[in-house]
From Swiss-Prot:
Ranges per topology, Extracellular: 41-51, 126-141, 221-235, 297-300
Keywords: Membrane, Transmembrane, Transmembrane helix
Transmembrane regions listed in the UniProt entry: 20-40, 52-72, 105-125, 142-162, 200-220, 236-256, 276-296, 301-321
Designated name of the protein: Uncharacterized membrane protein YNR062C
Subcellular localization, as worded in the UniProt entry: Membrane
Ranges facing Cytoplasmic side: 1-19, 73-104, 163-199, 257-275, 322-327
GO cellular component: endoplasmic reticulum; membrane
Amino acid sequence: MSIAQDRGIVFKLLSIYRAAAGIFMALAQLIVIFFGYCDFKIKGYRIASYNAPTFASSFIILAVCLLLVVVLENPEVKVTNSENSLFSALKQFFRVERKKLISCLILLWSMFLSSFIMSEVVYFMPLFLTLHVNWDTKFQGIAFMVASILGVTGSYFAPKLINVGCSCGRAKDGGLEESDTTGSETVEVKKKDSLYSGQVFLSIFALFVSLLGQAFMIGASEALKHKSMPPTNSGIFFSAGMSITLLGYNFLASSIPALFSMYIDPKLKVQLMPSIGAISGIGKLVAPIVLAALYGTRLGLSIAVGFGMILVAVSIPPLIWLRKKRC
């Protein structure tokens, strides 16, 4: 199997995994919808729609953790000096040629950005739909479930969009592959280039899709603020913006890890995996802090989502550079 085919299959499998995870995340909103009907008291403490889904989710997570403790086995791990191992891996990462290092840093920033975008949607969804539109928890659950299902189509269609570009490249090189065996290496290089260009283009396209979704969210907020649209219509408009933003997020989250794997040695990537995961996780930790501070200003939601749009916009030129300056 060629390297291009192998990478294409891995990219497709990762996208399928993301699509499945997104669908289960969307279906999890059924818990929110079901427990949104709760309204009773336990020794004076009221369990209602605003806290019942949280309690239910906590107990489900606890049950899953206990199940994993019973089912999973703890494999034997070879004892190594993890500090030296991580330190040497970091030194090896930063000692690569300058252009490759810049490319890796651009992709790491894109991973951070994708998690920031996701947190932006999750943060503002309850704020806007509860405080401004006055939707009940169950209606918010329905809105987020629909937005998640529509957004997760990004993971489903990502490999198909990549395959369109790759199939065009294969059609052009088909004659060479059949007529000249010595040209197989050239064909393989062209396939890899086609796969790479397609994934970078998908990443750039994802950022533009995210910009469109964020613009919808700001538009819904401003329309409600100036009473240009009824609250229910504003809520639907805002949910449409969430769907589009999540679509861009899933496109980006499908393509960026695959691109990063092209720039880094597989063994080095395994050693740095905790650090790479931490960079993505930082986006989810930073987003609520930054967005809450901006939301507290006079412009509120508009300036907070606008800040996210600025981050997305400034990330487009580096990806364009990445497409032109492949290492």
